[in-house]
Amino acid sequence: PRSEVGIDIEQYGQRVHKVAHKYMRPDELISEYQGEDTWSLLLHWSAKEVMFKCMDASEVDFREHLRIMPFQVCEHGEFPAEEYRTEHKKKFMIRYLLHPDFVMTWQVTSAYSVNECDTP
């Protein structure tokens, strides 16, 4: 069996706010982490990069064809996502890690589960 693998790392920064309208769908929810929404925006962008890398498709519009399902941002976790560009309409389980300087997202299989934050 063939595994789909994608990974993306995005440096922390405010520039993501300026381009959010190009990749955020109206039905995607932004959640705050440590009192700001930058982390959520970065995770959405990075996750969509991962999805694109795992798709065998061209002309993918990140806003129209890729959707991140609602999740609560934690230091690390996973969340479901879907693509609407291909005939297969793949579902993804995006895993992520927050670091003070960057976010990292990856996907190895097409599993579908729920995000749960670790509680201290």
Across the structure, where does each feature detected by a protein language model lie?
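Core catalytic alpha/beta fold that binds nucleotide/phospho-ligands
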Residues: 1-120
